[in-house]
Amino acid sequence: TEKNESFPCEIFGITTITDNENLTNSSKTALRQLLTDCLTKTNLKIENIQGIKVHGVGGNSDEMEQSVLQELFPNTETILVKPYMGHTLGASGALETTFLIEHLQKTDVKRGHFLNYFLGFGGSNIAWILKVGE
């Protein structure tokens, strides 16, 4: 039998914004604000983030996302989930966070902070930090 080891993690610093600039594609301004607001709310700095679970739908907004991430987090690893799961619309936050936790359990990561963000239709955007370890 396989031994189940504890993998403590928590979601904190949940931040939401509404992007009024474009209801179907997110703007650079809104994404930048979402990510920086999340860091501010959690009192974390850019260098405290070990990885970022990107939205990455395979569409027009991917280039914009990469531009903002390169500007704010030039040396932080990105984790892309949607190519493996598809676009799950309203369930993406729960499913992609579960997928990320499963991924991290299979790596040598025992602790750290991982930024997750989701860009929804109608400009509803949310971000949070997944804290792994105690």
Please tell me what each predicted stretch does.
Residues 12-24, 48-58, 76-93, 111-121:
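Cysteine-centered functional microenvironments
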Residues 125:
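Short glycine/serine/threonine-rich phosphate/pyrophosphate-binding segments
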Residues 28, 32, 66, 90-97:
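Short alpha-helical patches at coil-to-helix transitions and adjacent helical residues
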Residues 1-51, 122, 131-134:
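Condensing-enzyme catalytic core mediating Claisen C-C bond formation in acyl metabolism
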Residues 71-77, 105-109, 134:
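Terminal domain-initiation and capping elements
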Residues 60-75:
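Active-site-proximal gating segment of KS-fold condensing enzymes and close homologs
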Residues 1-6, 88-110, 128-130:
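Active-site-proximal alpha-helical scaffold in enzymes
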